[in-house]
Each structure stands twice: as C-alpha cells, then as structure tokens.
C-alpha cells in the first residue's frame, strides 16, 4: 500500500469516528467519546509521520541520483552521510520500516551508503510528557467535534481515564444501561480495529 492510499484510508476512517464521537456524547458516554478522540489524535500523528516520511524518501531519491551521477564520472559510488541519516530516520517509521530495511541493505551492498546503524532511541521527550500532550490534544478534538456539549461537561468527567473497563461498568446503572455500554464497547473496538489496520 502506498503512502498516498494510507493517507486516504486514514482520512476516510476519521470521518466515521467523528460521527461515533458525536453519538457517544449525545448519550453521555464520555468514556467511549474520549477513547475515540484519542484514536483520532493517534491517527493524526500517523498522518504527520507519513508526510514527513514521504518527504524523506524524496530526499533519499535525490541523494541517490547524485551518488549515481558521481559513480559514472568517478567510477565508484559516493558514501553519503546525509542518505544514511535519512535512512536511519525512516527505519523508525512503522508504516514503511520493513521496506526501508530491505532498501538500506541493498544500498549497503552496492556501496551507496556505509553500514547503517539504526538509532532506536525515541524522542527526547519522555513518555509522561508525551502522554500529557496527547491528553491535551484529545480534549481539543472532543471540543472541536462535540462542540458545546463536550465543553460544558464537568472537568472531572472529561479528564477521567478511559482505559479501565471496570470504571465504565461502575458508572452504568440498570440492565438497559449495561447493555448499551456493551454495544458502545463493541463499536469502539470495531473502530479501533479498523484504525489499527489502516495504520499498520
């Protein structure tokens, strides 16, 4: 699957999630609404990475063209530190990591780049900082999609953690509410599954 088709699939799925969030807010199911908003934040970050990866692939192609031109005139391929840097960066991208591994091995064999060393270190931000940033983005998505309805909800309700199923069960009262909660969970899982397939 190409980067372009991946972006198209993610955008289409996000429109479906928008509707699911609005429906969840209407029935006061903030657990599902916030979980779905988190999925949108994750998808948008994936889209951002895909655009960055696309630009880096184009840059690699440019550097390879220069290396090949050098090989024609000098008789050997130039070892480009810039190409190595870009390849190492793309090796971290889950969307195209497998392709880049094979690509980099072939370039190493032909001498286009030196033996690559993939840096496994993530962003300088620690996980706690990233989590806080994601929570802020989730609240923004909820407000943007659900509008005043979500904005008027108590702060404590909007900030509650969404990843504890037992917590959701405790907030539901009566048999009908429990059945509705199960349906919402199934809907959420189905959407998560589709989003995961798009991003993988």
UniProtKB/Swiss-Prot annotation:
What Pfam family is a match for this entry?
A: Snf7
**What Gene3D superfamilies has UniProt attached to this entry?**
6.10.140.1230
> Where does it reside?
Endosome
The protein's UniProt keywords, in alphabetical order, are: Coiled coil, Endosome, Protein transport, Transport
Q: Which GO terms describe its biological process?
A: protein transport; vacuolar transport
Q: Which segments of the protein form a coiled coil according to its record? A: 2-23
Gene Ontology terms, cellular component aspect? ESCRT III complex
Family matches, as InterPro entries: Snf7_fam
Listed under subunit, the entry gives: Component of the endosomal sorting required for transport complex III (ESCRT-III), composed at least of VPS2, VPS20, VPS24 and VPS32.
- Describe the task this protein carries out: Component of the ESCRT-III complex, which is required for multivesicular bodies (MVBs) formation and sorting of endosomal cargo proteins into MVBs. The ESCRT-III complex is probably involved in the concentration of MVB cargo.
- Tell me its family: Belongs to the SNF7 family.
Protein known as: Putative vacuolar protein sorting-associated protein 24 homolog 2
Q: Which gene encodes it?
A: VPS24-2
